[in-house]
Regions:
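Radical SAM enzyme [4Fe-4S]-AdoMet core and its adjacent flexible, acidic
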Residues: 54-55, 59, 63-65, 70-174
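Conserved alpha-helical substructure of the radical SAM core
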Residues: 1-59
Length: 174
């Protein structure tokens, strides 16, 4: 806080494996720094969502990288998609601002609209789209990165999707 940092992002690996996460969130919040979370969502039970909220968490960004089969394949865990959606629902039920984190690759670009439609039905209204980071697990799938032309098309699809929701009177943040 003394250095003017407005936000601290707790991310991974998976930050929810830390038993002291709520303590760290409360410390940041008490110091005037906005604590936010980046997670795969699978460890967010109803009780954990309330605990995170009570500690002062301001936002949970849950990573979903495709529709169920593609997401589970990417995550290497069967049921990861369903676990992420349950985590999202638990956060929303606890009153936490919650959004989607989606890394667009050649392998999951076709799922963009389907994932947004599905999670909008759950109550998500914030969608953050990312390009592939060549660090961590991204080093294993560098070949799945979008070409510049495909990236432009994906961005255009996100813009078109946002406009379509707006035109229907539904506001989403992208």
């Amino acid at each position: 806080a003394d250095y003017g940092a407005p936000v601290v992002l707790f991310s991974g690996g998976e930050p929810l494996v830390r038993e002291d996460l709520e303590e760290l969130i409360a410390y940041a919040d008490d110091a005037g720094i906005r604590p936010v979370l980046s997670t795969n969502g699978t460890l967010i039970t109803e009780q954990r969502a309330r605990s995170l909220r009570d500690a002062g968490l301001k936002y949970a960004g849950v990573s979903v990288d495709g529709l169920p089969e593609r997401n589970d394949e990417f995550r290497g865990v069967e049921g990861a998609f369903d676990g992420a959606v349950r985590g999202i629902e638990n956060c929303l039920d606890a009153g936490l601002k919650t959004g989607l984190r989606y890394t667009i690759t050649e392998r999951n670009a076709a799922d963009l609209e389907g994932v947004v439609d599905l999670l909008t039905d759950v109550g998500v209204d914030r969608f953050c789209f990312y390009h592939l980071d060549y660090g961590g697990r991204g080093t294993e799938i560098v070949d799945a990165d979008l070409s510049p032309a495909d990236r432009r098309r994906a961005v255009q699809r996100v813009c078109d999707m946002t406009r379509a929701y707006h035109d229907r009177g539904e506001e989403i943040e992208t």
